[in-house]
Every structure is written in C-alpha cells, then in structure tokens.
Swiss-Prot record:
Protein name: 3-methyl-2-oxobutanoate hydroxymethyltransferase
Catalytic activity: 3-methyl-2-oxobutanoate + (6R)-5,10-methylene-5,6,7,8-tetrahydrofolate + H2O = 2-dehydropantoate + (6S)-5,6,7,8-tetrahydrofolate
Keywords: Cytoplasm, Magnesium, Metal-binding, Pantothenate biosynthesis, Transferase
Cofactors demanded by this protein: Mg(2+)
Record GO cellular component, one term: cytoplasm
Catalytic residue positions: E184 (proton acceptor)
Amino acid sequence: MKKRVRVPDLVRMKQQGEPIVALTAYDYTLARLVDAADVDLVLVGDSLGMVVQGHETTLPVTLDEMIYHTRAVARGCQRALVVLDMPFGSTQNGPERTFEQAARAMKESGAAAIKLEGGQAMAATVAYLTERAIPVIGHLGLTPQSVHAFGGFKIQGRDQAAAQRIADDALALQQAGAGAIILEGIPAALAQQVSQSLTIPTIGIGAGVGCDGQVLVIYDMLGLYGDLAPKFVKRYLDGVPVIGGAIGAYVQEVRNRQFPTPDHSFEK
C-alpha cells in the first residue's frame, strides 16, 4: 500500500522543490481515479454546490452535505491527503464553535484536514484549531464564499493595497499554524511573491506557475462544462461531446432494439 500523504509532507515537498498536485473530487468513483494517478491532495470543495448541485454560488452548501461527499471520497483514496472544505457559515462563529464543527466534520467524514477561507480575521480560529490537532489549509484571494462582498467572481489583489493585504493575510495564517494556503484568482507575480515569502506551501488556482502546487476543479479540467470554464482552466479532456456521445449512442441502441444483445443477456 502506498504511503498516505499528510500535511507535513506538503511542507517537505515545498522544501525539496517538488510541485504539489491537487484536484477536487466529490464522489467515490472519481476519487479512486484521482488517487490512482498519484494526486497528492484531494479537496472536497464546496464548489460541489455549483458543479454537483447546480447552484450559482457555493453558499447554499451545508456541513452535512460536505461530510456526506467527503466520506465517499475518503473511501476512494488510499494515498492522497483528503481535505474537507468548511462551508459558508461554519467557521464564522468564533474559534470554539468552529472547532466543534471541524472536529465533527473530520470524525464523521474521514478527512485528514479541513480548509477554510479568510486571512487575519481567521488567524485566531486557525491557531485554536491547529493547537487542538486539526490540520488547516488556508484559502486567500478570490474566495468564493465572499462572492457577494466582492461583487462577483473577480480577480483579487490587483492594486497595491489589496496585494499587501493578501501578503499580510498569508503570513498571519502561517504564523497561526496553517499547513498550506490555496491562492485563488490573484496576479501571478503576487502569488509568486507570497509563495517565496512563506515556509509553508501555496497551492494555486488561477494564480500562475509560481505557486508550490496547483489545484483545479475536476469537472473543469475534464471539460464537462463546455465553454463555461474559467480562463485559467486547461481542459485535458473534451468531456461534453465524449460523454454526451456515449449517452446518445445508448439511447439510440435501446430505441432501435440493438441493446441488449445476447452478449449482455443471461440464458438461464
């Protein structure tokens, strides 16, 4: 059996200059494929609210739903570090209440770490969690749970003050004990600067090549949304015509009584 990745391994990978590979997953079947490909970190993101549930934002996702999906993903991962994304409203009620939520989430889901959004305002909470054996991955930049405060899904850190705030937030999270930080939707130069200033790794999504690792939403990189994927996504499969074509072929064969054939039937 392969050695399971833990949060300290991510720090070691940064120290050795080894890029960290991360992807999202939301179910057992895709988690098995991702894990078999030696992905280092599997994030069960609250992005499932959009790509699985069909919401316009991540905000409607509940902690119970995150636990449900993470439990399925954890069953499919033998090596990858499984991280549960704490949904909107589960980390904003102070360190003690957040600890209760996070401890329950890890206990019931099988996750080995949790992710939460926010910088200096969340530093006390991050410290409280890490002091109590809950590994934390931070998330800065275009944090989806703040979509309404941002006025939409907009690139962050473009002016000097905003860039400095992100850099200060990253340092605060590191000092609070975060094991890694996701940098999303910020200029590549800023992401590289932040990455070089930290001893913990950064994992970028729409943040350029200067981060210590990369993460993508798996449905985006598999091309399951046609032309709706963000600019920073590279499609490694054009999934809509491939999967849509397979479904269409099945429909036609059933309607034409071409399926099932004797090869797919039982005689006795």
